[in-house]
Amino acid sequence: MPHPEHNTSVFLLSLGCSKNTVDSERLQAQAEASGITFTQQAEEAEVILINTCGFIEDAKEESIMEILAAVDMKNAGTVRQVYVMGCLTELYRNELQEELPEVDRFFGTRELPAVLDALGARYHQELYDHRSLLTPPHSSYLKIAEGCSRACSFCSIPKIRGRYLSQPMEQLLREARLLQENGVKELNLIAQDITVYGVDLYGKQMLNDLLMRLSDMEFRWIRLLYAYPVGFPLEVIDTIGNRSNICNYLDLPLQHCSDPILRSMNRGITKEQSLRLIEEIRNRNPDIRLRTTMIAGYPGETRKEFEEMLEFAGSVRFDRLGCFPYRHEEHSPAYSLIDTVPEEEKQERVSELMELQEEIARKKNEAFVGSLMTVLVDRPEEGEEGLILIGRTEFDAPEVDNECLLESGSPEPSPGTFVQARITGSTAYELHGTVESLME
């Protein structure tokens, strides 16, 4: 192991998505190898490092607010330096440097060695697959690709992150093995688009091959997130059904169902093709749970087209669904369109779709009452009637999906423990139950 070179203390604030989290984890592992220490409180650090998000306006505003708070601490003498990295810098480096001269350095999304150098550390090539987890130690992400080569009109990710670049399979397997050795039990595969994994490196889709190799390891749960619907390799659905440690779960963001909107979004798929894909997935694996996301209020979306989305969601009955109002982002291709739907109307459409989904989710969850389910305990929490355990089933991804609230038993299962739980009640987004037994 490399010897310590510096003992600077750093407070690392990682904002945005799970892909950003992985970047921050890699940075922290590299810095720690050079003797850098990381603190849990900004007040205890010499340096504040903020890994920003620049995807939508709300995320940009959060990033700016955190930068300003860090600058205030620097001006007050609480910290010595402030560094800013990530997606916001990638989009607005010149403007940020001009408006925030108090920030010592700005770094983009592909400048890890330069960030380390600024911290007084160096990049260790032999540690390229090491990470210091910022997630609970039993659950982690495996980022299988960088960037995106799709051209969805509402999205600025290709501009921020560059073209799609698959990570070599052997490298991913080594990284996964390290995560497993460090106690990770749930592995969540992520990328901007997992569907085309391998095409740029191997000339063909390799998601199924990677999934089977990972399944041969000793992870209890492996989960697939961010599957692009066009060209999704259906053999993956068969593998999910055949392998007990791959969750019966697929995150398949569709974004809309109306053909004119899908064309404008440049999604490369029609409503009918979406329906056929969903039908094929469910036919191949009736146990699978599907998650999707939708955008309401896209430029040109009429009330009729929104009602088409309502009807679509009502007939497909997704197991998990998130809906977001369209954001008119200046670095996305859709910025050239007129933002026709008023903000208030966008929010009303989001609420209307989510009310429909809430009723669907409530009925789906009611079907679990009385059953015995495997639950991964994430954390204890103080409830109104004492300590409860917060966990998830295989049908629920971290942070975005449902939770299972369990009465604390004796002995109390620790975070990262799998339990058999009897489901005694439900709401739209929660299951309630009791622990019947701990699992090996």
UniProtKB/Swiss-Prot annotation:
Location (main, coarse): cytoplasm
Span of domain TRAM: 366-437
One GO MF term attached to the UniProt entry: 4 iron, 4 sulfur cluster binding
EC number: 2.8.4.4
Binding site for [4Fe-4S] cluster 1: C17, C53, C87
Listed SMART domains: Elp3 (SM00729)
Catalytically driven reaction(s): L-aspartate(89)-[ribosomal protein uS12]-hydrogen + (sulfur carrier)-SH + AH2 + 2 S-adenosyl-L-methionine = 3-methylsulfanyl-L-aspartate(89)-[ribosomal protein uS12]-hydrogen + (sulfur carrier)-H + 5'-deoxyadenosine + L-methionine + A + S-adenosyl-L-homocysteine + 2 H(+)
Entry-linked PROSITE patterns: MTTASE_N, MTTASE_RADICAL, RADICAL_SAM, TRAM
Pfam families hit by this protein: Radical_SAM (PF04055), TRAM_2 (PF18693), UPF0004 (PF00919)
Keywords: 4Fe-4S, Cytoplasm, Iron, Iron-sulfur, Metal-binding, S-adenosyl-L-methionine, Transferase
Domain Radical SAM core: 134-363
Subcellular location: Cytoplasm
Record note on cofactor: Binds 2 [4Fe-4S] clusters. One cluster is coordinated with 3 cysteines and an exchangeable S-adenosyl-L-methionine.
GO biological process, one term: tRNA modification
Record: residues binding [4Fe-4S] cluster 2: C148, C152, C155
A cellular component annotation (GO) from this entry: cytosol
Cofactor: [4Fe-4S] cluster
Domain MTTase N-terminal: 8-124
SUPFAM superfamilies reported for this sequence: Radical SAM enzymes
InterPro entries named in the record: Elp3/MiaA/NifB-like_rSAM, Methylthiotransferase, Methylthiotransferase_CS, Methylthiotransferase_N, Methylthiotransferase_N_sf, NA-bd_OB-fold, Ribosomal_uS12_MeSTrfase_RimO, rSAM
CDD domains named in the record: Radical_SAM (cd01335)
Role played: Catalyzes the methylthiolation of an aspartic acid residue of ribosomal protein uS12.
Family: Belongs to the methylthiotransferase family. RimO subfamily.
PANTHER family linked to this entry: RIBOSOMAL PROTEIN S12 METHYLTHIOTRANSFERASE RIMO, RIBOSOMAL PROTEIN US12 METHYLTHIOTRANSFERASE RIMO
Identification of the protein by name: Ribosomal protein uS12 methylthiotransferase RimO
Organism for this UniProt entry: Chlorobium luteolum (strain DSM 273 / BCRC 81028 / 2530) (Pelodictyon luteolum)
Organism placement in taxonomy: Bacteria, Pseudomonadati, Chlorobiota, Chlorobiia, Chlorobiales
Gene field: rimO
